[in-house]
Every structure is written in C-alpha cells, then in structure tokens.
A protein has these predicted regions:
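Pyridoxal 5′-phosphate
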Residues: 1-214
Length: 214
C-alpha cells in the first residue's frame, strides 16, 4: 500500500524517525538486543538521555537451535513498562534472521510497538511487510536493491502512523496528513529518486525467488 511507504534516505534515518517520534519518558522501557547495529541503537540512546526512558539490552544466542530460543529472549525481557521493541531483521554480526513476525505478535498482545532495522535483509529475499506484522520497517536501497546511495524506504503500518512525527518540516507540513509528510524535504535530489525506481524495476525483473536462491 503506497499510503504505508515513505521514501527516505537510508535505514538510519528511519530508525531516527521512530526514536524521535514515540513519546516515552521515565519509567518506560525500550528493548534493544545485543546484536543490534549501532545505527539502530544510537538514536534510542540519544533520546533516552533526553527523555529518561530505560534501554533494556538482552543477549541473543550466537548459534540458536531454533527461533523459539530467540523469541524466549524477547519474552523474558518484556515487562509492564515495555513500550517499544527495536530489532534488526537480519544481524550484521553473524547473519541471523530474527523472527520478526513472532516477536511482533507477542509484542502487540501487550500493546508494544515493534520497529525493524532491515538494512541487511531488504532485497535479499521476498518480504511481505503485512505478514511480518511489525509497526515500522526501515531499509536502505543501495545495499541489496542496488539503488543510488541516499535512497531508502520506510514502512509504517496504517494504524501505527499516528505515533510518527516528521524529522524535517517544510511548507507542505500543515496541509498533508498522509505518510508523505515524512518525506517532505522540499528540494530533493531527483536523480536518486529515479534511480531507486529503476532499481526496483530491475529487482522485479530478476525476481525475489531467484535472488533468494543465490
């Protein structure tokens, strides 16, 4: 759904967008496991210092025997104060693919938002964002989609968009309440946008199944 996708610059911007937006304060907790990428961790650390919420850092197994082992780590880390789980889809440390869908289902049963850093997975295999059930999903285009650098995508589930606030505002801010408000940079580098479109066309030409098989 195009009303759930905004064009951003990279994954880091998307994770900053979420950390900047969600109203948290003293007593609230955000879960960030120990395999998170620094670019997805630092935004939360920054806002934790300003707003006073707590960051919980559970340790994931290096060689898990099943996805249930990973899910259990998140389950044990959740408390009545947990408001957000921020997690990578695929780790840059050992290549683990984390069970985003199962963690999201568990989180939503307790009104916890889930933000996903997809820098290492977007473009590597077929992904159904609705099926993952996460609230937010940020990815860069230049890694496995082969777009120009400086292009990324940000997914926000429709019923979770109410939590988001633009990182940058300009003259269209007050007349646009759609997800477009998150990409309202005024002047943009249009060749990058065109390059992203061409990269998506090329990706679709090859097909997700062939890329995943490799």
């Amino acid at each position: 759904d195009k009303e759930e996708i905004a064009l951003i610059h990279n994954t880091t911007e998307g994770m900053n967008l979420v950390a900047h937006s969600i109203e948290l304060g003293p007593g609230d907790e955000v879960i960030l496991a120990d395999h998170e990428h620094p670019s997805g961790t630092v935004p939360w650390q920054h806002w934790s210092e300003i707003r006073g919420f707590k960051i919980v850092r559970p340790k994931l197994p290096i060689l898990p025997e099943s996805k249930e082992e990973i899910i259990e780590v998140y389950r044990k880390a959740i408390t009545s104060n947990t408001k957000v789980i921020s997690m990578v889809h695929g780790t840059n440390t050992n290549g683990m693919i984390l069970p985003v869908k199962e963690v999201s289902q568990m989180a939503h049963q307790q009104d916890i938002l889930v933000a996903v850093d997809a820098a290492q997975t977007a473009g590597t295999f077929k992904i159904d964002l609705h099926d993952l059930e996460c609230d937010f999903y940020a990815a860069s285009g230049h890694k496995f989609m082969f777009s120009p650098k400086g292009m990324g995508v940000f997914y926000a589930r429709k019923d979770s968009q109410k939590h988001l606030k633009p990182l940058i505002v300009s003259r269209a801010h007050f007349r646009d309440e759609s997800i477009r408000r998150l990409e309202n940079y005024n002047t943009r580098n249009y060749p990058e946008l065109l390059g992203m479109g061409t990269a998506v066309d090329y990706y679709n030409l090859i097909g997700a199944e062939k890329r995943e098989a490799r």
